[in-house]
C-alpha cells in the first residue's frame, strides 16, 4: 500500500529526474549554439559592446561623472551658456548625401568643446591581452595605461574587431568604410583607425608599445581649463640641422602614436576626409597598391597629420586671420620646452611623448615633462626616430601671442 510518506518520496524522485533531464538538455543546446557561432559573429558582438559602452568623462581635478543611461556618447553642441545638466537637443534627421565629406562627418560627430574628455584609452594589436599570443614584451606597456588611469575604459582592439567597429560607427558614411577596407597595408589601417576612433568616440589613442609614465590628468597645465581644450598633441621631431630633410618629412613633426581628443574635433574631421579622398582617388586610378614604405608618413602618418594641424592653425574658419601677425609655422614650436596652446589645441614639447631619444632637446624618462615612453616597435625606420592665446575653434578669433 502506498503511504503518504512513500508518495512524497516518489514525487520528489520524479521531480529530481525531470530537473536533471531538463538541465542536461539545456546545456547541450547551449553548447550546440556556442559551437556554431563563427569568429566573425563573436567579433561583431564585441564591437557592438565596445561601441555602445558609455565611458565616464573626467575633469582636471580627477573627478569623474558617468553618462546617464539615456545620454548618447556623442552629444550635440549646446547653446553658449547652457547648463551642462540639460539634455542635448535632439537633431532632426536630414539628407547628408549632398554634403561634402567633411560636413557629413561634422553632422554625424558634432564637436562640443565644453564637454569633458571621454575616459577612453584605445590601442590596437593582433591579439588582446587575454590571448597567450599577445606577447610578453607588450604586457608591461599595455598594463601601464590601466594602472595610470583607474576608472577609464581601456580597450585593445584586434584587426578583426576593428573592422566591425568601424562598420558600426561609420555606417552612415560609406566613403570612409570603402577607404578603410581598400587600404592594402596593415600600417595604413592602423594609422587610419586612430583618427577614426578618436573622431567618433574621443579619448586617448596610444600605440601598443607605449608606456604611460603619467596620467593624462597631468598632461594639460593646471592654468588651462579642460573645457577650453579639445586636442592634445606632442612634438615628435624638431631636427634643428641643415640636412633635416634627409631624415625627416617636416621641420617640426607632430607625433601620432599618442593623441588625446574630444570626439568631433575639426582636425580629426579634416584628417579623416583627407585620407578617405586620397585613398579613393588612388583606388580609382589603380595605384593604391603601389605605396612605398617611405611614403606612408605622407599618406596616413605623421607628415600628413602635421600638415592638417598647421592647416587648422591657419584656417580663417576657426581663427581671426585679420588680426594675425602672420601664418603659424614650425618656427612657433621649435626648441619649446613647455606646453603651448593654439586655439583649443595644446602642444606638448618633445620630452612629453618622446623622452629618452637623446636628441633634439628631449629630456630623459624621469623629466617632469615626460608623459609617455615609446619603444618604437614596428615603426618605419625612416623619419621616426611662450603660450599662444586661447581661442574657440567654433568661431573666428584672434591668435595673438601671450607670455
Give the positions of each predicted feature.
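Small-residue hinge/turn detector
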Residues: 191-203
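Glycosyltransferase-associated regions of secretory-pathway enzymes
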Residues: 1-190, 206-403
